[in-house]
Amino acid sequence: MNKQFLKAGMLGLLVAGWLSQSVWAQSDPTGKRRVTSTYAITNATVFKSPSDPGSKATILIKDGIIVGVGTSLTLPKEAKVIAGDSLFAYPGFIAGDGTMGISKPKDAERPKDFVSSNPPDEIAGITPWRAADDFYTASSSQVEDWRKAGFTISQVLPDGGMLPGKTAILVLGDPKTNNFLNSNVALAANFRSSRGMYPATLAGVMAKFRDVYQNTALILDHERLFASTSGVKRPQVSPTQEAMKAVVQKQQAVLFTAGSELEIRRAIALQKELGFKLILTGLENYETVIDLIKSSGAPVLIKLQLPDEKSIKAQKTEGVTEATKAQYARVKEAYETALKQAALLEKAGILFGFSTADAKASEVHQTLKTMIANGLSQKAALAALTTNPATILGISKVSGTLEKGMLANLILSTDTLFKEETQIKHVVADGYVFDYEIKKKSKKTGTADGKSENSSNAITVEGVWEYTSETPAGSSGGEITIKRDSGVLGGTITYDDPSGSGKASAPIKNASLTGKTLSFEFEVSAGGMSLTVLISGEINGKTMEGALSVPQMGSFPVKATLTSPNLAN
């Protein structure tokens, strides 16, 4: 199958680019070597914490630790100086949880005597003994994407069923090593049922969780009795029970994924019944249960993701029935409520951070700005990215702020963090410096309807675009045809067929135009595999520049020219 990939122009180049990145380690602009372990970021505007108004200071880093923050530091001769005069320094972001760099374990084979009503734990998705450490790859392109977005620490979740395993906390630093701060941190849990076997329903998942928890409590009692009393039969402990002991003894929390109001209620009900430590994660729809969350005392990690507004933009204003109008109103109300939920958590005084699971790194900053535009304060947004998750994860002594003795995790941006034109120029993770290209942006920005501010000219997106993508191995390209149907963008894209037989075509999915930025996805099938390719670029007149990204392979520059504008629908 590798030969088949390498026959293809675009996919072959992507694979070549992927392989060239496998030795990636960045502390100089080329990312190939670390030239020093001592850095001085001089005269930057430093925000030490979410409540800090910011002031000019120098940050001195040595061996991955912040050794000083101030205005009168003595810099060692070996320090590499990063001029920070026009830069703004913030603590590196912390993902309360995520799946970056995590691979899926192999499915267990069903035994010949398999009984669907009583399957083995591993087949039923009950694998609390698994550790995220064993499935993490530091060199994954997902890790780089999130680091580029400003994230320097993440708790990672193992993939799997209702009890997939134990989480780990790691630093997104040296790509050549797995930089774990803590292992076996918490038990990941969710309401994911099993297909074709017990537990096959949400109620069944709850019952099974109780069963596993209570049987482990009985085993602990049995072990205590065996240790203190003669004549007692030796307890037989299963791998599941052994892994659950720390949870039952309240040494480890349960990190429960609960996206909906119903799942949140169920997770809190289980916690009240059984008494384990609870952290709620993956929250999406929670406006109606905020009081319940607050009364439970559980910290929360909300999804760093907002609903797509396409359904709102596609609503028609003419020729629709009253029932349809009412439905439109309900959809719009639900959408607007979702945008305000984070602000409601802040108002309620609930400690919350962010979960990056299922979110896109490229959309993080726009998501944060949208939350702020809908009532979340900038201070609370920064706290949810730094000090709050540090507290929730129990790592506030080493991360979350820019102070002497903390891990050297920080971002350097071109302006204050939540301004529209702000970009991240450097990320320091575990003392490793990662440099990123700063793109020049026009002062005239686009609006949601494709109009340019201060101008009556519309951004032209419909038509045929000829594109090329550059990778370390060369270039490849094709045509992008964009059409608009009832206000919704769509179309097709051509690319080099992985089979080596000329060009192939695929429909464009999830297309959107935000300001001047056009983004969309398409699927490439080859050798039984399906790859999701994301293209995102900024349009200026009849040209577009951006990136073509493929999970596990990386991101590559892409350029396009509009050759046939205003294609008729």
Region spans (language model):
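His/Asp/Glu-enriched, well-ordered alpha-helical/loop segment
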Residues: 43, 105-106, 112-121, 253, ...
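Histidine-rich, glycine-flanked metal-binding segment
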Residues: 28-32, 37, 46, 50-92, ...
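Polyanionic/metal-chelating signatures
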Residues: 139-142, 147-285, 423-424, 429, ...
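Acidic, glycine-enriched loop/beta-strand segments at the rims
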Residues: 28-33, 46-58, 70-71, 377-385, ...
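Extracellular/periplasmic ectodomains of large secreted or surface enzymes and adhesion receptors
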Residues: 26, 36, 343-347, 353, ...
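Active-site core of metal-dependent hydrolases
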Residues: 231-335, 352-353, 391-393, 399, ...
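Central antiparallel beta-sheet cores of small beta-barrel/beta-sandwich binding domains
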Residues: 459-539, 545-566
